[in-house]
From Swiss-Prot:
The gene is lysC. PROSITE patterns: ACT, ASPARTOKINASE. Changing residue 361 to A: Change in the inhibitory profile and absence of dimerization upon addition of threonine. It catalyses: L-aspartate + ATP = 4-phospho-L-aspartate + ADP. SUPFAM superfamilies: ACT-like, Carbamate kinase-like. Tetramer consisting of 2 isoforms Alpha (catalytic and regulation) and of a homodimer of 2 isoforms Beta (regulation). The dimerization of the beta isoforms is stabilized by the bonding of threonine. Substrate binds at residues 25-30, 45-49, 74, 125-126, 151-154, 274-279, 292-294, 298, 360-361, 374-375, 381-382. It comes from Corynebacterium glutamicum (strain ATCC 13032 / DSM 20300 / JCM 1318 / BCRC 11384 / CCUG 27702 / LMG 3730 / NBRC 12168 / NCIMB 10025 / NRRL B-2784 / 534). Belongs to the aspartokinase family. This is Aspartokinase. Its EC number is 2.7.2.4. Keywords: Amino-acid biosynthesis, ATP-binding, Diaminopimelate biosynthesis, Kinase, Lysine biosynthesis, Nucleotide-binding, Repeat, Transferase.
Length: 421
């Protein structure tokens, strides 16, 4: 008997009809001889609606109370799915994140899972029940306060539970039926991938793929939890994410796909003194404010005045805050200026095949040249090339790269709804 953890996104649970459809799938999995644990996101746009409601009551709501409010969304869908399963003649028991033993750090709004002690879930499984766990939430061990896990928290909940329960597979259900070589809404002939290594999926998640959040893939890799990305609208087996890139034979290594990201902003510090410790001051101030940095470029030092320019990208949502911090440092450091640009986007090519295929970088650059796309920043890893370009050029760049590396097929991809959640 296998133990299967299934996670259903908000689009899969946005109405009573879809909840019943999900319940039928869950019961079918149980009848096939599996133990089943289900992690639910909030229904449809419930989380956004709760955020709007909170803002109407208090423009700056306390973080603790916001977490109390937002976790209600998952508890609602949790109970409804359990009810739907019971109506089909199967036994189900729902759990909040804290009841399921999801223990987190104290940070409200973006807590991290530190441990999972799923004793009550195991007991219910031993009794033959289907266990339904509210995603996106946990509890801090010291304060006992409810916490939320941030964007994609339900994916992370599912993977963490799968690891703690030693599950055979963690299935992530949404409105897409797998991981594609590109976003089918941008590249219509994008092809679904049957299998990816953890490293390839980590790179795709890090550079903009919305199918799985980075934290969930990191967790899966750390605990070797096989992931399967599937659609709740079809019976297609989807994409399996498992194993290491090192296990892929050299002759089978390929280029995996193209991803785009519109969530970043570019910040440039002009005229900063080019001496030890100056760049460290910039990035320490941003780190203390918990602002993540992605791409970084430092220009060659000016011989005349001993200064240089530093350009980096950060989440657009943190861009204004980063500027406020750096403007204060500008006065202390006597920098020339600090510039902000949020009309940029990142396009990336990922694949284990880069290690064994010389010339990939040249072809990448030539493909963008041929569609008149200018490159502003470049970042690479062993299996990835990313460039920062104008946001308006992203779609054309993605299509050009997809065609250049022959990643497409003859048929158009099936898009059930399109959000990937």
């Amino acid at each position: 008997m296998a133990l299967v953890v299934q996670k259903y996104g908000g689009s899969s649970l946005e109405s009573a009809e879809r909840i019943r459809n999900v319940a039928e799938r869950i019961v079918a999995t149980k009848k096939a001889g599996n133990d089943v644990v289900v992690v639910c996101s909030a229904m449809g746009d419930t989380t956004d609606e709760l955020l709007e409601l909170a803002a109407a009551v208090n423009p700056v709501p306390p973080a603790r109370e916001m977490d109390m409010l937002l976790t209600a969304g998952e508890r609602i869908s949790n109970a409804l799915v359990a009810m739907a399963i019971e109506s089909l003649g199967a036994e189900a028991q729902s759990f909040t994140g804290s009841q399921a033993g999801v223990l987190t750090t104290e940070r409200h709004g973006n807590a991290r899972i530190v441990d999972v002690t799923p004793g009550r879930v195991r007991e219910a499984l031993d009794e033959g029940k289907i266990c339904i766990v509210a995603g996106f939430q946990g509890v801090n061990k010291e304060t006992r306060d409810v916490t939320t896990l941030g964007r994609g928290g339900s994916d992370t909940t599912a993977v963490a539970l799968a690891a703690a329960l030693n599950a055979d597979v963690c299935e992530i259900y949404s409105d897409v039926d797998g991981v594609y070589t590109a976003d089918p809404r941008i590249v219509p002939n994008a092809q679904k991938l049957e299998k990816l290594s953890f490293e390839e999926m980590l790179e795709l998640a890090a550079v903009g793929s919305k199918i799985l959040v980075l934290r969930s893939v990191e967790y899966a890799r750390a605990f070797n939890v096989p992931l399967r990305v599937r659609s709740s609208y079809s019976n297609d087996p989807g994409t399996l994410i498992a194993g290491s890139m090192e296990d892929i034979p050299v002759e089978e290594a390929v280029l995996t796909g193209v991803a785009t990201d519109k969530s970043e902003a570019k910040v440039t510090v002009l005229g900063i003194s080019d001496k030890p410790g100056e760049a460290a001051k910039v990035f320490r101030a941003l780190a203390d404010a918990e602002i993540n940095i992605d791409m970084v470029l430092q220009n060659v030092s000016s011989v005349e005045d001993g200064t240089t320019d530093i350009t980096f990208t950060c989440p657009r949502s943190d861009g204004r805050r980063a500027m406020e911090i750096l403007k204060k440092l500008q006065v202390q450091g006597n920098w020339t200026n600090v510039l902000y640009d949020d009309q940029v986007g990142k396009v990336s090519l990922v694949g284990a095949g880069m290690k064994s295929h010389p010339g990939v970088t040249a072809e990448f650059m030539e493909a963008l040249r041929d569609v008149n796309v200018n490159i502003e920043l470049i970042s690479t890893s062993e299996i990835r090339i990313s460039v920062l370009i104008r946001e308006d050029d992203l779609d054309a760049a993605a299509r050009a790269l997809h065609e250049q590396f022959q990643l497409g097929g003859e048929d158009e991809a099936v898009v059930y709804a399109g959000t990937g959640r």
